[in-house]
Amino acid sequence: MDAHGTPQPEPSYGEQFTHSAIQGVRAEGKVRIRYTELPGQFADGSHYSLRQPHYRFTDLGYGPMQPGTLVSPRIAPQMPGVGLVDAIPEADILANVQQQASRSDGIHGMVNRVFDPFAGKDVVGRFGWKANTASLAHQSAAAFHGDIGITSEKFPREDCTPKQKDCAAAPRGGEKGGPEIDNATLEKVIQYQATLAVPARRNYDNVDVRRGQALFAQAQCAVCHRPSYTTGASPFPSLRGQKITPYTDLLLHDMGKGLADGRPDGLANGQQWRTPPLWGIGLIPDVNDHSFLLHDGRARNTLEAILWHGGEADAARQQVLKMPKTDRDALVKFVNSL
């Protein structure tokens, strides 16, 4: 860990494992995934099955990994509304902590505090599966660097480890040794992301959707998936003072051993995850041609994602397990309408 609580890069493979590479550079290797089916049963006697992922690295291009390397798989987060999330006042996020601190049911979220290179200080994290980036600018520049190896003013070093000499010798895209994406271009990308609209709700007057909304509140899902906020300051005038319904508290919660990755990140421990916004979740199959959810995509649909909840959310999960199928279907219809 560094001084900000960030895990240190693996010596040979860095912070992020990459299975592909440009011409003339060796790929880091391959990742093999297999799943174990975990059967379960609802109170009404109907059955379900969850899939537990197992990962194996093969064809390593730069030698074995260091023993004890912490690995945490990720799927890409959803993009709609990120500019609005960026504009939620920090005071509102901290208020969520205070409101939950007085609860007696074990739901006690906390913020992650991370170093924001754009602010030059530690601030409340709000993006990433463990709330490990602080702003949309931070998230964007970090993704350019970590996901596709593009340097910027705040992330100027090439993402090559000492063993990756072919990576270090590859051509650079920046002019005169400067960053590969300049500030003006990065700002345009940030503006594009910030103004991605949230899709309109569907079927909100449907009787099952409305009943599902009541069940959502009854199961205490809305404690962590806080429905609404009013946005505050933003570089983009159209995003200021907006009533929004992202359904998140942006806090870290212990989700139990079933979802644990064992990898700390800032103040987040190996069992804690940020509550993801739910808006647009029902359109993921239309946009991405799949319905994989949670940090590593193990859940194949909304109901499976709910059934993976543990830890602070286990009481909510138990309520869903007790629901008859008609109620479970209504709950899922509501979530997918957001």
What role is predicted for each listed range?
Residues 1-338:
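Periplasmic c-type cytochrome electron-transfer domains
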